[in-house]
Amino acid sequence: MTTREIDRSSWREELDSFSRQHEGWIVSVTMRTASGDVAVAARDVPLHGVSPASPSSDDIAISVGSSRTILTHEVHEPIAVQMELTEDEADRALIIHAHDGTTTTIEFRSPMRPEEVDGIPFREPL
């Protein structure tokens, strides 16, 4: 596996592209603190998107869940964003490092390149 650093100046564009490519894909969201404690915020839920939390902030919002229940997790004061890739160069996980030493990972249940996906992600009825 390889990791690709995303330049801070292109976070908005990269996160927007990531969200459009992977909306509806099944992910798990975990946080690891600087002391090594691990918490799972969400497991095996559809990704809604990853974006700046607000226009005036560098904080990053991660939205996951069904259309009936959406969970949003915010990463405050991010200092680095990385994409972890499989050997086939498919996106495996998006990793966000925060100033306080916390690392938030959005990991795909089934990593694959977007062009390998057959069809359109399932959308729940409203």
Tell where the protein language model's regions lie, with residue ranges:
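Short secondary-structure capping/turn segments at boundaries of alpha-helices and beta-strands
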Residues: 14-18, 32-35, 48
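Helix-rich interaction surfaces within compact, conserved domain-sized segments
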Residues: 74-126
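Short coil-to-beta-strand transition motifs
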Residues: 36-46
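A short, Trp-centered hydrophobic/proline-enriched beta-strand micro-motif
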Residues: 23-32
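Short secondary-structure boundary/capping segments within folded domains
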Residues: 19-20, 37-39, 52-53
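Acidic, aromatic-enriched beta-alpha/helix-loop junctions
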Residues: 45-93
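N-terminal leader/targeting segments and the immediate start of mature chains
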Residues: 1-23
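Short acidic, glycine-rich loop/turn motifs
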Residues: 31-37, 64-66, 96-100
